[in-house]
Amino acid sequence: MTSKSLPTRTTLSSGTFYQIYPPSFADSNKDGIGDFRGIISRLDYLSDLGITGIWLNACFDSPFKDGGYDVRDYTKVASRYGTHEDLVELFHQAHARGIAIILDLVPGHTSEQHLWFQQSAASEYTDFDDRYIWTSHAFEGGAGLAFIGGEHPRNGAYIINFFKSQPALNYGFAELTQPWHQPVDAPGPRANQDAMVEIMKYWLSQGADGFRVDMADSLVKNDGTSKRATIGIWQSMLSQVRAEFPNAIFVSEWGTPTQAFEAGFDADFYLDWRGNGYNLLARNTDTPLERRNDASFFNSDSATGAQEFLDMYLPQWERTHEAGLFSFISGNHDCPRLAPRLNEQERALFFLFQLTMPGLPFIYYGDEIGLPYAEIPTKEGGYARTGSRTPMCWDSQLPNGGFSLGNAPLYLPMTDTSQNVAQQRERADSLSHHVQKLIQLRSQLPALDGFADLEFDLSLLKKHPKVMVYRRTHHGGDSVLIALNAGNKPIRVEFQQPQAHELFRCGDVAYPDLSDHSVVELGPTSGVILSV
């Protein structure tokens, strides 16, 4: 193991992050559930892949009615993943390999079993009365907000964010329209802000490098589309944390970069479920297993072109590219996986795109080997999302695909072992090696830095709607050209760059004149990176 420099806020942009769903990555104690020690045992794999950061999904103490996103104690780890010391050791071992770890922070709600809520729900007055949002009496609804009434001694109904088990923390209301609405600077909302600041400081002091913040844009209710009050709260909280931990990394689940970066976040996810066009690329479907109904751009059989996505993406990038990292994801625990809807060549082309675009790319565990979505029963509130959370497959020759060497029932069934790390390591042309090479290029070429300039050639789209051609340039210096054909027919692309030099190819790529790379012929589902 060689020591590598740890990414910080100022060096994030050349790296690649990897999302781990803890119960499904690696099981060290043979109980069928992934854990911190299991992740430690696989850090060398991530280091070899070129990963510079890990986003660790919710791992705090929880009754797991929503996969851990119903937190019972923010300063205690979930015992099924190990001990506090195990998590600290994970920080240490990751840092020794130059890998940062950001934890999942869920600031908008807690579990109904959290001590704060238990005290807030009591019939007698406590200091926690206003830490959650309660209506004036048990028979009063939420005035447009989801609510639960009649389950606790307190005479009121409480507002929930998602499930009944997730009471919303009170950060106030931007518009006060009900007697029980409180302003953002009321004592209850202020106490919640202070508590979140202390929670972040605590985990940073334990060795965490930052946080991915769940539903970061949804703290203040009635905040409209501008999110002015929520932005102000984050500016206050993050400035307090950074006064003590200036290198702390903050990534938001916001999906509106103009707002997220103003709020103080370093990176913001480009989310499928926002109305921003990202779903058009690889998840333009309601049937995660059926290719026939998939209208994604990277499905070579679909008619979907690049123009609609670019019309929505480029204005956002132009407004925000100097302020933060608008980040493409391969997937996550809440959305369908790329496989099996997209075949391996299409997934390879998707990664060529993702890893050459601006921002800070996030790879969901297993996507680099083609781990498929599985149609399985719901687990811990996952419902349709459960199929994207199945165990990582390490070696098909080992019990349980190497995820767990014990006999205990697995957290989720391993439905397919055909795509596994061991098999892909043996194939020089595997998806895993393809991703590894792209990550290496991204880390080595300043022109592929997350903050490097971006310029799309839109002239080809009318004739070839499933083609993308774009240039990345590092501050007026080195440039690379990327051309990709997501369609099922070959095309010819001409550049005004006779001295272009090929750096990487995906699929069938040919040059009519071998001494001149200014004209390239791209086969179906193919792409190329050229140095110019």
Task: Place the predicted regions along the sequence by residue.
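Acidic/aromatic-lined carbohydrate-recognition and catalytic surfaces
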Residues: 2-191, 205, 216-263
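Loop/helix patches that line or flank the sugar-binding groove of alpha-linked glycan CAZymes
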Residues: 12-13, 242-244, 261-264, 279, ...
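Short beta-strand segments
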Residues: 19-21, 55-58, 211-215, 251-253, ...
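Short, solvent-exposed loop/turn segments at secondary-structure junctions
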Residues: 23-25, 60-62, 107-108, 209, ...
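Active-site-proximal helices and loops of the catalytic beta/alpha 8
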Residues: 92, 108-109, 114-127, 134, ...
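An active-site-proximal structural segment forming one wall of the substrate-binding cleft
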Residues: 189-211
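Beta-strand-rich binding/interaction modules
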Residues: 489-509
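C-terminal beta-strand-rich structural cap/linker in extracellular carbohydrate-active enzymes
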Residues: 514-532
